[in-house]
Amino acid sequence: MNLKGKNVLVTGIASNRSISFAIAKILKDNDANVVISYQNDRLKERVLKLADELEIGNAYQCDLSIDHDIATLRDNIKEDCGNLDGIVHSAAFAPKDHLSGKYLDNISRDGFALAHDISSYSFTALAKAFKNDLNEAASLVTLSYIGSNKVVQNYNVMGVAK
């Protein structure tokens, strides 16, 4: 697979065990120009170390629950790399207390909304923001998990969100 000259945004890298980390590595191994995002300063140092490990030069802060952050991400990528050839959406989040115990005992309206905003809607928000900055035949991919269609203990609200 030759991806030389292709610009691909990968979201959701949290550790070297993340599916998104493996995807970014495969993209890099096939000569893609990979750009990544991280949520906030708390994750910055960890994600930048992973970017260095993969020899990724472009890493941008972007809270996917904030439209202005997504617009800034788009503008920064456009300025530094040009249009995108792909987006890999691997971002997911739910409040920790929503991922244990019985689903109905721990779920709240705010936690449910937050899990869906980050884990699901943010893919649409990225697509909307980048719609005019994608090269022809660009691909947008979002990831799911077996817990979205089978019962997985403690996956709870994430099963519905993904």
Each model region followed by its residue ranges:
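Conserved hydrophobic beta-strands of the Rossmann-like cofactor-binding core
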Residues: 7-11, 87-92
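Helix N-cap at the beta1-alpha1 junction of Rossmann-like dinucleotide-binding domains, i.e.
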Residues: 40-43
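Catalytic loop of short-chain dehydrogenase/reductase
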Residues: 12-21, 92-132, 136-162
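Conserved Rossmann-fold cofactor-binding substructure of NAD(P)-dependent oxidoreductases
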Residues: 65-80
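Canonical Rossmann dinucleotide-binding motif of NAD(H)/NADP(H)-dependent dehydrogenases/reductases
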Residues: 3-36
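Local beta-strand N-terminus motif with an aromatic residue
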Residues: 56, 83-84, 112, 137
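Residues at the C-terminal ends
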Residues: 28-29, 79, 135
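Rossmann-fold cofactor-recognition segment
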Residues: 51-68
